[in-house]
Structures are given as C-alpha cells and as structure tokens.
C-alpha cells in the first residue's frame, strides 16, 4: 500500500512525531526519517495556514501542477509492488491546496475517486452533505464515506452513517470508532472497514 500527503501545513520539524506524515509512516511500518518524509510529503510548511499562504511566507512556490506531477511519478515508480494507493489532501474538498488551486483541481488533475471522511461532532452531518453535493457539482466521484468518531463526538459513528444514508442512500458509509486498544485490536477493527471500502470502489 502507498499513502501520500504531498502538502502539510503547521509542520514542526522539532516535533515531527506529532505530524500527519509521521502517522502515515507509522501506519506503513516505515521509519520517520528525512528520506521517507520527503518521499511522502515533500511540501512541509511551518505556518498552520492554507498551504499557498504558508508557502509564500517561506518564499517557496506551490502549484497544483507540481503536486499532481509528484503524485503521478511516485505512483508510477511504485506501481509494481503496490496494491492500493491513497492521497490525502488538506482540509475540506474546497480548501486551497496550492497557490492556484483547491483540492478539487488536484483531484481532477489526477483523475482520482474520493473517500470522504466525516466526523461525529455537532454539525458533521450538514458538513458531509454539503461536501457530497459540492463533489457532485464539480463532477468528482465519491467512492466511499468513512465516519470517523470525533474526540468530542455527539453521536456514535454508525448512527451518523445511518443518518447520512437517509439523505444520500447511494453512498456507502463505513463507521470507524475511536479506540487505543493496541495494534492487533486496531487492525482487527480496521480490516472490515478497509474491505468494505474496497468493495465500494470502482474496478480499474
């Protein structure tokens, strides 16, 4: 499996273990070092701001074409030994990911389907429905929906998934409860979710 998060804001190199790239590397059983960080997240910015703004503060360029090229080249190099690939964006569907583009433009450039991650906080159902409709308006295919239990959630993830299904029954919802019961228990909980996700992904 290959997972990339090309662009990261709010990255503190002095506390890299708390970053999103560190979590991805840990999930892939890869070491947290400069080479692996660069391989999955080449654009890392200190300021916790929209990436285009954070890039300008550091005097760096950040264009959607460069991000898309990085993803394509990485997938091409790794295709022989990879059974699945994931690209994590930043923020929501319409959040800026570069100086000249939102996640929408990157998704279009790559031709990827989207796995939408919703929460269980107050307002999460409305946010998810708005994102679903925005994706439709932009012609972006939603392959699956994960309902990830928020730290201060007000509903169980399975209940949020069921409620979303009342409004958008065509979209698969997979609940993911919180928990820290150790690696074995976590994998046992995640395996059915991953299987359900791939069951809903289009072939090819």
Where are these regions (language model features)?
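N-terminal phosphate/diphosphate-binding loop that engages ATP/GTP or pyrophosphate donors
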Residues: 1-61, 72-77
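Short internal beta-strands
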Residues: 5, 115-118, 143-149
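C-terminal lobe/tail of nucleotide-utilizing enzymes
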Residues: 35, 133-204
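Phosphate-binding/switch loop-helix module in NTP-utilizing enzymes
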Residues: 50-97, 104
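P-loop NTP-binding module
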Residues: 72-89, 111-114, 178, 194-204
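Short glycine/serine/threonine-rich phosphate/pyrophosphate-binding segments
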Residues: 93-98, 123-129
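Charged helix-capping and loop-helix junction motifs
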Residues: 98-106, 129-132, 157-162
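Inter-motif core of Ras-like GTPase G domains
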Residues: 98-120
């Amino acid at each position: 499996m290959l997972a990339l998060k090309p662009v990261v804001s709010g990255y503190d190199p002095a506390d890299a273990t708390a970053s999103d790239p560190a979590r991805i590397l840990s999930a892939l059983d890869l070491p947290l070092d400069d080479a692996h960080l660069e391989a999955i997240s080449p654009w890392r910015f200190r300021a916790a701001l929209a990436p285009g703004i954070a890039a300008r503060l550091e005097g760096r360029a950040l264009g959607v074409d460069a991000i898309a090229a990085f993803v394509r080249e990485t997938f091409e190099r790794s295709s022989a030994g990879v059974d699945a690939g994931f690209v994590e964006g930043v923020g929501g569907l319409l959040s800026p990911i570069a100086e000249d583009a939102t996640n929408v433009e990157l998704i279009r450039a790559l031709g990827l389907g989207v796995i939408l991650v919703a929460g269980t906080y107050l307002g999460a159902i409305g946010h998810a429905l708005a994102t679903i409709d925005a994706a439709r308006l932009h012609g972006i295919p939603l392959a699956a929906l994960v309902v990830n239990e928020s730290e201060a959630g007000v509903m169980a993830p399975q209940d949020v998934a069921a409620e979303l299904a009342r409004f958008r029954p065509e979209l698969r919802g997979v609940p993911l409860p919180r928990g820290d019961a150790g690696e074995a228990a976590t994998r046992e909980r995640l395996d059915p979710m991953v299987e359900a996700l791939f069951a809903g992904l289009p072939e090819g």
